[in-house]
From Swiss-Prot:
This is Hemoglobin subunit alpha. Residues 1-141 form the Globin domain. It comes from Chrysocyon brachyurus. Red blood cells. InterPro entries: Globin (IPR000971), Globin-like_sf (IPR009050), Globin/Proto (IPR012292), Hemoglobin_a-typ (IPR002338), Hemoglobin_oxygen_transport (IPR050056), Hemoglobin_pi (IPR002339). Coiled coil: none annotated. One of its GO terms (biological process) is hydrogen peroxide catabolic process. The modification N6-succinyllysine is found at K7, K11, K16, K40. The modification Phosphothreonine is found at T8, T108, T134, T137. The keyword Iron-sulfur does not apply.
Amino acid sequence: VLSPADKTNIKSTWDKIGGHAGDYGGEALDRTFQSFPTTKTYFPHFDLSPGSAQVKAHGKKVADALTTAVAHLDDLPGALSALSDLHAYKLRVDPVNFKLLSHCLLVTLACHHPTEFTPAVHASLDKFFTAVSTVLTSKYR
């Protein structure tokens, strides 16, 4: 459960990210593919070379979904229901991959915002990404 302090940290961080969310999403996805090569199996039709336009475009989709989640912190299941359906029923993404991407998102944000990435912000973002991952995998059962 996200506390009021977590919600404040998440919204504040997302405000600071601003127009870079799509870039950071692409970078985190790149980082995921490089660090955890098995994640590439879901994208056989993509050019997965670092910085590819397809990876950047999908990273923007990830960032857009997270921006939606930030705007609906009190109703993540409602805000992400369609995305949960897509990943569970059509794409059948292994749930562990959400954890791997979450880790890479944290690393990417820490690299770009080292001063703002305090232990409290880190913990809040980790809880947020875990909550989003939980929603996205909730329909697997």
